[in-house]
Amino acid sequence: MDGAHDMGGVPWSDPVQPEPDEPMFHAEWERRAFAITLAMAMPGGWNIDMSRFAREDRPPEDYLQKSYYQIWLAGLERLLLQRGLVEPDEIAAAKSLHPAKPVARTLTRDGVAAMLHRGGPTERDAKHPALFMAGERVRARNIHPPTHTRLPQYVRGHVGIVERVLGCHVFPDSNASGNGENPQWLYTVKFEGHELWGNEGDPNLQVSVDAWEPYLERA
């Protein structure tokens, strides 16, 4: 979807100013919000793409006024409400008011290290050969889906060169909507700065983007 989360290359956004010696968390509640989001994915039954969409699917004014982990917390609340694991009055009261709903799976403290070590591999067996090869010119499709996508707006409609073929991976657009993994070939595509930003762009700039096959067409 197009939204405030996709800010790369927009002319009105200020440069990112990294915080010197930035800590991983600025407050204890941020640490807890991060941990709860990871832990609740198991009983909640959502995947990483659903979680991303829950965070980004909000009005720009709401998204931009929230801090990073406030967005995470808002996304978590939405997922919990959608699955009936909490009620709106519990969110408002910030405490449990009703009997807990039964869940099929939980993540215990003893299982955290193994889960993080295992990770979440996304590569899958391919059902057909890759459509593109390294060195081939491709154009990023000018798409504007209303749901989750990993194709940045600033490359849409522009031509690049396939740098690498990365294998067949879970397709985020389908996975985020609950329509299955629908694995698709994934490519690293290199775009020249002048192609993205015009003649005023840095002539030495190149941007590489990982793009799934449905995002691309032959140039």
Model-predicted regions and their roles:
Residues 1, 104, 108, 217-219:
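Basic/polar N-terminal segments that are highly enriched at the extreme N-terminus
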Residues 1-102:
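N-terminal intrinsically disordered, low-complexity, charge/repeat-rich segments that act as generic
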Residues 12-37, 79, 119-134, 142-219:
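Basic/aromatic-rich interaction segments and small domains that mediate binding to polyanionic partners
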Residues 103-119:
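Short, basic/aromatic beta-hairpin or loop at an interaction surface
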